[in-house]
């Protein structure tokens, strides 16, 4: 089936028809660079990296823009706290963000603009809004007049009158309407500023994204993404100011990923349940975090806990164990591969894997279902390899086809990037760190056991095996040698 995606604007799944056939323009709101990124940022990054990869896999020429908000109240406050310049703070946390994204296996977007590089674009749009009657200047500030834009709140589905009635908005007598939002903020002592027709000042947050997206994608483009928390006010305000300035539809499809909860509670600094990406990666490898995030549909809430991460790592290990067995089987000569003569089920699973993967991904990027199809094939593979039986050259072709399909799926999801034996060895080493025995000692005992067996000293061989078992180390003898794993 053709790609369908859930559009926040309509509240429905819609067929994906880009404005220009074969080309996609996609803008995703990046981070405000004043601190280390948390796992909510990791989810947004991984989700839209997956979408970017799948669109390219589907044959689209994608221009992917993700910005840095490098001027904002939070950045200024952090700079003042540290007694430094806002640019020092922004540059520091741009660098740490890039490091985090690289560790999580992200593809770099086509362009990663900084807000401060587009001040002239921002001023131009604000002036156009004033000229169009959608904005007004007062005492060096410029505000968007929400009542001049009848479609305001069309993305979130809120009602302006209801919001005004129950508003917790600080009353500013200079505003025509309490819901009017800042496009330009007049300078205050100790703050960075730029010259403008309304005096020295700096841009508001919302106008920055409109300016950067329009600069690289034009006044109207295909996909705008971000976290669910950005629907209001950020994306709502982007629509108002962009369509008010240009007189045309700003974005065709709005995509929003769900929240991350911590042990079933919403993640927040005030609750003290706030984890940075770096803190998580001290406990779990990057691919496990990526796999954990992709196990859920991108719009669903995601409950983060150490237990859920451990379960995700166990699931990823099952795939890597199957891939290691598959690679081992494919290293044998074709005539040495023994598979059940009744391997028709496996052949059917393999032939259908990529089509079923595409079907799941075409259904609003349903990675949960897509991974389910992969696990289905892996289970059949494990059963097949365990049974043994007759041999077939066609069965080898099925194994090769499965390996190629998993590699292709991995490229779309950003998974299975590591040699299976290396990944499994790293996980065993992690487990061994919590044992009273080192990997080096284990390997030394394996060498000693091999020598004992060669010399037919089976008593010593059994003693070594039993000793390791008492330390929760299980030995696995294979034609290629002896491996070990933590029980």
Curated annotation (Swiss-Prot):
**E.C. number:** 6.1.1.16
The entry's Zn(2+)-binding residues are 29, 209, 234, 238
Q: Name one Pfam family in it.
A: DALR_2
| Motif placement: 'KMSKS' region | 266-270
Cofactor(s) needed, names only, are: Zn(2+)
Major enzyme class: ligase
According to its UniProt record, where is this protein mainly located? cytoplasm
Keywords carried by this UniProt record = Aminoacyl-tRNA synthetase, ATP-binding, Cytoplasm, Ligase, Metal-binding, Nucleotide-binding, Protein biosynthesis, Zinc
Quote the record's binding site residues for ATP. 269
Record has Transport as a keyword: no
MF annotations from Gene Ontology: ATP binding; cysteine-tRNA ligase activity; zinc ion binding
Question: Does this entry carry the keyword Magnesium?
Answer: no
What does the record give as the reaction this protein catalyses? tRNA(Cys) + L-cysteine + ATP = L-cysteinyl-tRNA(Cys) + AMP + diphosphate
Record InterPro entries: Cys-tRNA-ligase, Cys-tRNA-synt_Ia_DALR, Cys-tRNA/MSH_ligase, Rossmann-like_a/b/a_fold, tRNA-synt_1_cat_dom, tRNAsynth_Ia_anticodon-bd
> Could you name the Gene Ontology cellular component terms for this entry?
cytosol
Cofactor annotation remark: Binds 1 zinc ion per subunit.
Where does it localize? Cytoplasm
Q: What domain of life?
A: Bacteria
Q: Single Gene Ontology BP term?
A: cysteinyl-tRNA aminoacylation
> Which family, according to the similarity comment?
Belongs to the class-I aminoacyl-tRNA synthetase family.
Task: State whether it acts alone or in a complex, and with which partners, per the record.
Answer: Monomer.
HAMAP family annotated for this entry? Cys_tRNA_synth (MF_00041)
Q: What is this protein called?
A: Cysteine--tRNA ligase
Gene that this sequence comes from: cysS
């Amino acid at each position: 089936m053709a790609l369908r995606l859930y559009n926040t604007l309509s509240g429905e799944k819609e067929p994906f028809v880009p404005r220009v056939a074969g080309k996609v323009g996609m803008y995703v709101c990046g981070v405000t660079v004043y601190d280390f990124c948390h796992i909510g940022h990791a989810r947004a990054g991984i989700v839209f990296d997956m979408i970017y990869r799948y669109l390219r896999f589907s044959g689209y020429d994608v221009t992917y823009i993700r910005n840095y908000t490098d001027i904002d109240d939070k950045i200024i406050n952090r700079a003042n706290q540290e007694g430094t310049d806002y640019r020092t703070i922004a540059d520091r946390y741009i660098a740490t963000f890039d490091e985090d994204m690289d560790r999580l296996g992200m593809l770099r977007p086509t362009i990663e603009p900084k807000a401060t590089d587009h001040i002239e674009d921002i001023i131009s749009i604000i002036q156009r809004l004033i000229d169009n009657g959608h904005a007004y200047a007062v005492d060096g500030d410029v505000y968007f007049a929400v009542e001049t834009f009848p479609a305001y709140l069309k993305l979130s589905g809120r009602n302006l009158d209801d919001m005004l009635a129950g508003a917790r908005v600080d009353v500013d007598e200079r505003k025509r309407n309490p819901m009017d939002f800042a496009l330009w903020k007049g300078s205050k002592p100790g703050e960075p500023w730029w010259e403008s027709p309304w005096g020295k000042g700096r841009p508001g947050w919302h106008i920055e994204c409109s300016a950067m997206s329009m600069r690289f994608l034009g006044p109207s483009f295909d996909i705008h993404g971000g976290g669910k928390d950005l629907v209001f006010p950020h994306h709502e305000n982007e629509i108002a100011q962009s369509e008010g300035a240009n007189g045309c539809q700003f974005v065709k499809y709005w995509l929003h990923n769900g929240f991350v909860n911590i042990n079933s509670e919403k993640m927040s600094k005030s609750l003290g349940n706030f984890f940075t990406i770096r803190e998580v990666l001290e406990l779990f490898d990057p691919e496990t975090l990526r796999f954990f995030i992709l196990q859920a549909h991108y719009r669903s809430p995601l409950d983060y806990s150490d237990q859920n991460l451990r379960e995700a790592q166990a699931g990823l290990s099952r795939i890597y164990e199957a891939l290691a067995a598959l690679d081992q089987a494919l290293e044998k000569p074709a005539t040495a591969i023994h598979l059940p003569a009744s391997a028709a089920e496996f052949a059917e699973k393999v032939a259908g894997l990529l089509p079923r993967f595409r079907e799941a991904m075409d259904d609003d990027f349903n990675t949960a279902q897509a991974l389910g199809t992969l696990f289905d094939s892996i289970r059949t593979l494990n059963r097949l390899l365990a049974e043994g039986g007759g041999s077939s050259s066609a069965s080898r072709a099925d194994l090769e086809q499965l390996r190629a399909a998993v590699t292709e799926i991995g490229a779309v999801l950003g998974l299975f990037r590591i040699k299976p034996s290396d990944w499994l060895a790293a996980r065993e080493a992690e487990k061994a760190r919590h044992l009273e025995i080192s990997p080096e000692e284990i390997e030394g005992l394996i060498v000693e056991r091999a020598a004992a067996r060669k010399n037919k000293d089976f008593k010593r061989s059994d003693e070594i095996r039993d000793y390791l078992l008492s330390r929760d180390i299980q030995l696995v003898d294979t034609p290629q040698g002896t491996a070990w794993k933590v029980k």
